[in-house]
Amino acid sequence: MLLASILVLAAAAVAAVAAGGMLPGSAGRPCQAAFVPAFFSPAGWTRAVTGSNVPNTMILDITTSGAGSAPEPAFQAAVKKAQAAGVTVLGYANTSFGARPATAVEQDVRHYKAWYGVTSILLDQAATGAGKLGYYRRLAGFIRSVDPGAAVWLNPGLYPDQRYMAIASVVMAFEGPYSGYSRLRVPAWVSRYPAAKFAHTIYATPGSQLASAISLARSRHAGWVFVTDRSGANPYDGLPGFWPREQATVARGCHG
């Protein structure tokens, strides 16, 4: 699971649909958007929003669970800078697999809007079983009551009960090392949905396997993909060493 702040980046050339609709593609093929989960300080966002490939989306976390107890001026400035560059910012909220009180998550949603002007949310440590469907329906309904156009991302890290697809704009359906990704089995029902409803996070990827990982994600119907060579306790504490090449590879896969 993504344990703390997450930065999700999509190359500006790849116009993602905020509500999770089909990403534009060529010849009827689904397009991929590159996203980055990252434990970045506000200063660390500079590289991500600088250059020709401006991010499409960032997911913001202030603490290890959500918006925190007070606004952080440095993050407020970072959000404003990102939004001014055309970036959509989402707030991060930990759900502890459905064990965190819904009222606490809803308070995070209120704080993100009031303090940062952010209404779309990523619900991390999401449950996968049918027993928590009501919990996530409630949260998604609340998020969309705050802003009907808000995106709701769920991160269970694996494929959930299919009924979660009606709740989420995007489901992070894989989070793990490349060694495990090469053996991933995708449920047959996945092909019934737009690729833009699925995201895959692949870490500990050798540079020589970057193109392979992106190609595998495309073949597995993932419209959002993040690949990093980082590993260890926190593989998200910086951009991948091959980040410029990753952006270019994803863009070529989309438009080529």
PLM feature spans:
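Hydrophobic alpha-helical segments of integral membrane proteins
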Residues: 8-9, 14-17
